[in-house]
Design a protein with these regions (language model features):
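Hydrophobic beta-strand anchors of alpha/beta hydrolase catalytic cores
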Residues: 78-79, 113, 178
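Short, small/polar residue-rich loop motifs at catalytic or cofactor-binding pockets
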Residues: 52-53, 76, 173-175
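Thiol/disulfide oxidoreductase modules built on the thioredoxin-like
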Residues: 148-203
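Short, acidic, Ser/Thr-enriched surface-loop or helix-capping motifs
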Residues: 61-62, 182
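N-terminal targeting signals for export/organelle localization
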Residues: 1-56, 207-211
Length: 211
């Protein structure tokens, strides 16, 4: 009788183990197996995940109309927050972005260099349009009210602060990150100031081709 009980117990235990192993083998364990279609493209890691950057924003386009993020990012976009009176880093970074756009165009990938001004007082529509012409023929620029710009900056977790000065040639401290934003997906990647245009182009191409 004892042997029979042992056999029954062993059979039940074996069945339980088999069911458990089958469940583990066929059930995805979140978040470790969560699919990321862009995993092979990513060079950076965002604290809180990519969903924590971007979202709904409103800005003012070159024609004076108010536009949403859906209109701003209708194409794959390389987005930079800066100001036209910036004496050094802004021209370097947006020119680098323009070079990446040209490299992508050689691969038949259309991207838009986007410039969002953090200095609405001096960056009028006329000033922004002249700035865009100097950088790239497809560059689009946006401005807005202080509140609109602050909201967009917060959405993309950028930093900017106007230096205290009565001089009209005041400087604005700001972060120097460029963001890759895709239609339907929103923010997907960021590029630091020292990223080369070649790396930007290669990474952007990977995201676009897998979108």
């Amino acid at each position: 009788m004892t042997n029979m009980k042992n056999i029954v117990y062993l059979s039940v235990a074996s069945l339980f183990i088999l069911i458990s192993l089958t469940y583990l083998a066929t059930t995805p364990i979140w978040p470790f197996n969560k699919e990321d279609k862009f995993a092979q493209c990513r060079n950076s890691k965002v604290t809180g995940g990519s969903a924590s950057i971007g979202g709904t924003i409103e800005l003012v386009a070159a024609d004076g109309s108010t536009v949403s993020d859906f209109e701003i990012f209708s194409q794959p976009s390389l987005v930079y927050f800066g100001y036209t009176f910036c004496p050094d880093v802004c021209p370097l970074h947006v020119s680098r972005n323009a070079d990446a756009v040209d490299m992508l165009e050689e691969r038949s990938i259309q991207t838009t260099p986007v410039f969002i001004s953090i200095d609405p007082t001096r960056d009028t529509q006329e000033v922004l349009q002249e700035f865009a012409k100097m950088i790239h023929p497809r560059m689009v620029t946006y401005t807005g009210s202080e509140e609109q710009i602050r909201s967009a900056s917060k959405a993309y977790r950028t930093y900017y602060k106007k230096q205290e000065s009565e001089d009209e040639y005041y400087l604005v401290d700001h972060s120097t990150i460029t963001y890759l934003v895709l239609p339907k997906y929103g923010f997907v990647e960021f590029f630091r100031a020292d990223t080369s245009p070649e790396v930007m182009a290669e990474t952007t191409a990977c995201f676009v081709e897998n979108s």
